[in-house]
A protein has these predicted regions:
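Short beta-strand immediately N-terminal to the catalytic nucleophile in serine-hydrolase-like folds
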Residues: 100-102, 127
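Conserved HGGG/HGGXW glycine-rich cap/lid loop of the alpha/beta-hydrolase fold
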Residues: 17-71, 285
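Conserved alpha/beta-hydrolase catalytic His-Asp/Glu region
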Residues: 152-211
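Conserved acidic catalytic loop of the alpha/beta-hydrolase fold
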Residues: 81-98
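Catalytic histidine-centered segment of alpha/beta-hydrolase-like enzymes
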Residues: 261-270, 274
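Flexible "cap/lid" loop of the alpha/beta hydrolase fold
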Residues: 111-115, 122-157
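Conserved serine/cysteine hydrolase catalytic core
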Residues: 186-248, 254-257
């Protein structure tokens, strides 16, 4: 298990919101910044950090409305706002060069950031995200159904655990434990409620206008950062065909399919995910990043 002395919590302000982040490892190690998915949280990356922390600094942000970060009263849960938050984090930590990794929504945000500030990035890691996945895939329709059908509270922790297990039948028991611990909390009434802004996030996802959606193809075609695409071999979100089109469109994208994983690759097959990411990180050639900061 990870040495808990290497784990630190921090806070950063963005758009008047107080946002929480977690940092694992030495401050002077090469930085890897990680962005979670739609209804996730910073600590989802803890097993990944455990696999990297001997050589890298891993920083994970509770994106606005999730984890311990403030909810946005304006419900601005869209890419432009998330990228402002990421920029605030990067500047607060004075990260001159870093690798950016994102899952699903976090992957879309990572693509947007890479297009805006490529000079800061040594590499880009994308977990199961690509063009059209959020709008036209079977997985996107599944997620919309989940958002509509998710209860606002549970009578007990057992009920909450059973709900998450039905929603994520493939994730490991340790990943399920993490979801219970970090996505839920006990209210004063004794009911179990969500830590994240479930209603606001659902409204933003279900009612997004075309202008609020991220169109990834232009970003991918103009991407000039070494990129690792980690796709779930059983994903209903990012199809094998779209992943193939991404690598064909940009020679800088390296693709690895993780067998036995759905859209939630790092939760379903953590050992394979961590091994693939670590191998790729160890190969990146950027002396400025290697010296830390």
């Amino acid at each position: 298990m990870m040495n808990t002395a290497s784990v630190k919590d921090g806070w950063v302000d963005s758009d008047g919101l107080r946002l929480h982040y977690v940092s694992w490892g030495r401050d002077d190690a090469p930085a890897v910044v990680m962005l979670h998915g739609l209804r996730s949280y910073a600590h989802t990356w803890e097993p990944v950090a455990d696999a990297l922390v001997d050589r890298y600094r891993v920083v994970a942000l509770d994106q606005r409305g999730r984890g311990l970060s403030d909810w946005d009263p304006q419900r601005d849960y869209y890419a432009a706002a998330y990228v402002r938050d990421l920029d605030a984090l990067v500047r607060a930590l004075d990260l001159r060069r870093f690798v950016l990794v994102g899952h699903s929504m976090g992957g879309a945000n990572a693509f947007v950031y890479a297009a805006a500030q490529p000079e800061r990035l040594t590499g880009l890691g994308i977990e199961d995200m690509g063009p059209g996945a959020s709008a036209g895939s079977q997985g996107s329709e599944r997620i919309k159904r989940e958002l509509k059908e998710t209860p606002g509270a549970f009578a007990s922790w057992d009920d909450a655990r059973a709900f998450w297990r039905r929603q994520r039948p493939n994730i490991t028991e340790s990943a399920l434990d993490s979801r219970i611990a970090h996505s839920l909390k006990e209210a004063g009434s004794g009911r179990i409620v969500w830590r994240h802004d479930a209603d606001g996030i659902a409204a933003a996802r279900l009612d997004a206008t075309p202008a609020q959606l991220v169109h990834l193809w232009p970003l991918i075609l103009n991407l000039h950062v070494p990129t690792l695409l980690l796709r779930g071999g059983e994903s209903d979100f990012l199809s094998a065909d779209v992943a193939a089109e991404m690598t064909a469109a940009n020679a800088g994208i390296e693709r690895i399919d993780i067998h036995g994983a759905t859209h939630y690759v790092h939760d379903d097959q953590p050992a394979a995910f961590n091994r693939a990411l670590r191998t790729w990180l160890d190969r990146l050639d950027d002396p400025t990043w290697r010296v830390g900061g």
